[in-house]
């Protein structure tokens, strides 16, 4: 998702935004950044949720205060409450990360990993900013903007009994859904170009080249690990490249199931009919990102009239 180091002064500059789906997510993030209400960011692993949360903090009025990112899955059950709210044992006091981040922002990465009992205490904190340290009856207050992330839509986790319904309703006010990489095809080429530039500079090699087949493969691949997987795959390929030219074989990825051709599918079909089938699939994919026929024609390097006729021929965009 990023092609450069994060710049707190310009927090959203590191995002590659060409697809309509990602444009919507980033624009919502820019608007929601200015509010103090809890923010929920949902998206698959590797899609950039934590980076988006960080950008929201540095775009907000809290930008000069602390930003604390907490991996909820990494909090031991027996210590999670004291890590969040602090602890008092005799004369010894330890503050939690909410108190430490007072007037700043706390990112709870993987909110569903918290126990249901701790979710109840978090709900109370979200309601009025109050909490009690473990081992103490005195109430404390902290002014913190809370951002939560989840790989799975929270409403599904509510149905599974993993997330409290009341917490979900408290969080489901400002929500950003980060699209999976396979749903942002228009971003794959600029992401790949940016990553290759960044990686080649780190490895101190010339930026590798690639052809159209390589790019089409990137766009066809499922990318279960999303942007993070794309980056790691290109890093590995650049580390092993021999002649400064990347090929499909350089990626060392399993062939996408959708790319496997079965002869039975095309029994009694002519070559023109088979080509037409794949042409229609390509147009459907690109039309989702370029609903303007003029922009689609420009992207595919053909005339506006040719694209309009093809869309009409295949019944796309009716």
Curated annotation (Swiss-Prot):
Residues annotated as binding ATP: 43-50, 101-110
Gene Ontology CC: one annotated term: cytoplasm
Pfam entry (one): Sigma54_activat
Keyword field: Aromatic hydrocarbons catabolism, ATP-binding, Cytoplasm, DNA-binding, Nucleotide-binding, Repressor, Transcription, Transcription regulation
SUPFAM superfamilies: Homeodomain-like (SSF46689), P-loop containing nucleoside triphosphate hydrolases (SSF52540)
Highest taxon of the lineage: Bacteria
Domain Sigma-54 factor interaction: 15-239
Compartments in which it is found: Cytoplasm
DNA-binding region: 292-312
Activity regulation, free text: The DNA binding ability is drastically reduced in the presence of ATP. Tyrosine further reduces the binding affinity of TyrR in the presence of ATP.
SMART domains: AAA
Single Gene Ontology MF annotation: ATP binding
GO biological process: catabolic process; positive regulation of DNA-templated transcription
Role: Transcriptional regulator of the TyrR regulon, which includes a number of genes coding for proteins involved in the biosynthesis or transport of the three aromatic amino acids, phenylalanine, tyrosine and tryptophan. These three aromatic amino acids act as effectors which bind to the TyrR protein to form an active regulatory protein. Acts by binding specifically to TyrR boxes in the promoter region of the target genes. Can efficiently repress the transcription of the aroF promoter, but lacks the ability to function as a transcriptional activator.
Assembly notes: Homodimer. In presence of tyrosine (or high concentrations of phenylalanine or tryptophan) and ATP, it self-associates to form a hexamer.
Protein known as: HTH-type transcriptional regulatory protein TyrR
Organism name: Haemophilus influenzae (strain ATCC 51907 / DSM 11121 / KW20 / Rd)
